[in-house]
């Protein structure tokens, strides 16, 4: 976490409560990025594989729930800028999904090529998160009131739970 991130957290803290969708998204982002970094930094192919198996469903559930409850809300309610943010989010998730699928097809988690894929995943994920926690969080604050963001947070958690249960069943 950069100094700028820490300052932003401190400034947002008074306006973000535990059920605000931005707080929930930030928690998910932190968890996913940490798993991805641990996976990339691991020297063990077996550990990379285990971390990847943990990361993939976490990202899938988060992404689908975020698309359904956050991006779609931005598309339906906000300005052109908010809609652009949502469209970019969908594209970013698609790129991450494609990379995750490519990594899932490779069984050689100990290889330099797989580690290169993991590094690119970390970089893409970090950039995607940075954009969301900047532009998207700002759009959410401007376009939705506290009650709407809390309701969005509840719907996000419910959707994420449904997506996680689907992933387990598959």
Labelled PLM ranges:
Residues 1-170:
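Small-residue-biased structural context
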